[in-house]
């Protein structure tokens, strides 16, 4: 039994991290403190004026634990790591934990490549970015590949190594084939230097050089070469237009502000690179209530920059808590100086005002759309409750479907809708294990049995404090089950539920002869729902989604299996021998018919491997 009063009295006079837990043992909040005893006790002092969010959290605190650290900066680093690990309910959590893409030039390699990455490391490479729009990175890299003959393979190519046969890219002029040692390291590096110039905003120098070569080619009547250079000039100029870059000797700035309406908050981030706004991002955090803006921004910075690969040179905010500590943390992460500034007037202040205005507009538009959707979904759930005569509105709905082709690779899918909205994070896939051939009823029985067995097992683990509630994949049960089928599928579901003594209403979604949603089957009778337009659309959407999810899983399994060959199952037949056998015999059937002598005639085959093939196909 946790003795709250005793634990509060014995809190240490040291820096550290505290973890608040609810009655299920779940971590609902992680915080850091300069002095643990002062900070943790504040939550339980009635004299303290807490925000509504903190009051709601304190009501749910059943116990807490703490970790002592040597310094406040260590506590901050640990706090960020624990928030990322546990995703506590009452911490500010960004639903979109983005790592923005960069263009990476792998300068540590003898023959560098140009690739996209979301992780910046000290590996000797040169990075350009981040790019808020991922498609821009893809477009720029594709244009670079068309313009500069650089390699795209992942091979470890070293100058002076054994030459290998070049790929098709060499044949069509897209690569200089360093793998075949057709180009020296120094010559290849000259090409890479041009790529770096282009990505560094110095494309005009390259264009000038290409124009001179184009004019020379035209004077020498080499019109094809001149046309090719003209096309490359157009591509380079296009990259120059697209390229919004980071240069180490220019200002790289993020502007962060927020707007709160008393309940929810919208954070808006503007990214400025080389004096230009190259992108923006917003994050809406619900139920912040009356938490002060400096606390919100401090918590937002920890979450946002804890999950991004790039930290700018300067971050501008309207106000903030723990400014010096956060600067120290950002500098440690960046491995070079990063500064937080609060502008009072001038251009920087004006940009922050613009950022706040955008946050306000974004939140208002979100609320308007949310309220419209909420009203629509509320009506759908009310109508569904009335149509089926349910006791409560079906807040959580689970739908199930089976997919197979002629009995092969049977799979099951479960999709979830909460409050009328799809909840992909709760979707589940099942590979059928116990059923041979195409038997949808037995397959459905298997996946439903597994779903509720897992659920009951998780609930017991949660009750025994062996599993956190938020970690459960099946512990939340639905208010309504929708089966993609008629009475047969409904009966299977009811049979499984009765086995586990679970009482959940089950509906069947039926289609007409044109495979369009027709109605629902419930309690043995069909209910026509076409007069309920919004319900009809909702059921159709659920039916289409569960079918799509099942089909996509089935295709992915088929795709994996399509790469498997019978030859993979033969002992002593590796990738090389498999390729040689198929190249010489053209098909599996011909390999089956091959004699011992014919198999041995393949250079990579020996007596043992030939015997293995004959034994396998005997």
UniProtKB/Swiss-Prot annotation:
Subcellular location: Cytoplasm
Presence of the UniProt keyword DNA damage in the record: yes
GO CC term, one of those recorded: cytoplasm
Chain ranges of the GIY-YIG domain: 13-92
SMART domains: GIYc (SM00465)
GO molecular function: DNA binding; excinuclease ABC activity
General function of this protein: The UvrABC repair system catalyzes the recognition and processing of DNA lesions. UvrC both incises the 5' and 3' sides of the lesion. The N-terminal half is responsible for the 3' incision and the C-terminal half is responsible for the 5' incision.
Stated family: Belongs to the UvrC family.
Name listed for the protein in its UniProt record: UvrABC system protein C
Taxonomy of the source species: Bacteria, Bacillati, Bacillota, Clostridia, Eubacteriales
Designated gene of the protein: uvrC
């Amino acid at each position: 039994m946790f003795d709250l009063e005793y634990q509060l009295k014995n809190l240490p006079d040291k820096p550290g991290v505290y973890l608040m837990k609810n009655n299920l043992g779940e971590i609902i909040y992680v915080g850091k403190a300069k002095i643990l005893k002062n900070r943790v006790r504040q939550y339980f002092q009635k004299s303290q004026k807490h925000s509504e969010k903190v009051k709601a959290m304190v009501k749910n605190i059943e116990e807490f634990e703490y970790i002592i650290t040597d310094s406040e900066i260590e506590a901050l680093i640990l706090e960020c790591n624990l928030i990322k690990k546990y995703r506590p309910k009452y911490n500010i959590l960004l639903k979109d934990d983005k790592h923005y893409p960069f263009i990476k030039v792998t300068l540590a390699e003898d023959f560098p490549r140009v690739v996209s990455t979301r992780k910046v490391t000290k590996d000797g490479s040169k990075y350009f970015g981040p790019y808020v729009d991922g498609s821009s990175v893809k477009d720029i890299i594709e244009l670079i590949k068309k313009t500069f003959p650089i390699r795209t393979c992942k091979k470890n190519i070293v100058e002076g190594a054994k030459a290998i046969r070049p790929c098709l890219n060499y044949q069509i002029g897209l690569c200089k084939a360093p793998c075949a040692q057709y180009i020296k390291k120094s010559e290849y590096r000259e090409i890479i230097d041009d790529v770096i110039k282009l990505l560094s905003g110095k494309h005009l120098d390259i264009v000038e050089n290409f124009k001179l070569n184009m004019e020379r080619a035209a004077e020498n009547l080499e019109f094809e070469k001149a046309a090719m250079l003209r096309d490359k000039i157009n591509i380079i100029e296009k990259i120059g237009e697209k390229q919004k870059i980071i240069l180490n000797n220019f200002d790289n700035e993020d502007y962060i502000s927020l707007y709160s309406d008393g309940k929810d908050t919208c954070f808006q981030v503007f990214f400025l690179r080389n004096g230009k706004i190259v992108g923006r991002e917003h994050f809406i955090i619900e139920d912040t209530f009356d938490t002060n803006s400096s606390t919100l921004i401090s918590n937002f910075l920890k979450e946002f920059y804890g999950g991004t690969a790039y930290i700018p040179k300067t971050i501008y905010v309207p106000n903030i808590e723990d400014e010096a500590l956060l600067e120290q943390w950002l500098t440690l992460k960046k491995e070079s100086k990063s500064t937080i500034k609060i502008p009072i007037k001038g251009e920087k202040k004006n940009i922050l005002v613009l950022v706040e205005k955008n946050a306000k507009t974004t939140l208002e538009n979100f609320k308007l759309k949310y309220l419209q959707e909420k009203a629509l979904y509320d009506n759908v759930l009310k109508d569904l409750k009335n149509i089926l005569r349910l006791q409560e509105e079906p807040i959580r709905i689970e739908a199930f479907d089976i997919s197979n082709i002629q009995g092969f690779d049977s799979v099951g899918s479960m999709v979830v809708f909460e409050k009328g909205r799809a909840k992909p994070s709760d979707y589940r896939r099942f590979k059928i294990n116990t059923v041979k051939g195409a038997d949808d009823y037995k397959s459905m029985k298997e996946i439903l049995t597994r779903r509720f067995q897992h659920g009951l097992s998780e609930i017991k683990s949660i009750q025994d404090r062996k599993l956190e509630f938020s970690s459960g994949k099946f512990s939340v049960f639905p208010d309504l089950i929708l089966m993609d089928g008629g009475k047969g599928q409904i009966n299977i579901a009811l049979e499984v539920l009765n086995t586990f003594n679970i009482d959940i209403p089950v509906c069947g979604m039926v289609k007409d002869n044109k495979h369009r949603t027709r109605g629902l089957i419930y309690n043995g009778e069909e209910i026509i729902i076409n007069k309920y337009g919004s319900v009809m659309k909702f059921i159709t959407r659920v039916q289409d989604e569960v079918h799509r999810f099942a089909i996509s899983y089935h295709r992915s399994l088929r795709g994996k299996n399509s790469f498997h060959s019978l030859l993979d199952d033969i002992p002593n037949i590796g990738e090389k021998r498999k390729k040689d056998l198929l190249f010489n015999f053209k098909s599996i059937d011909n390999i089956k018919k091959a004699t011992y002598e014919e198999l041995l005639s393949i250079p990579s085959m020996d007596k043992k491997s030939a015997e293995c093939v004959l034994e396998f196909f005997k």
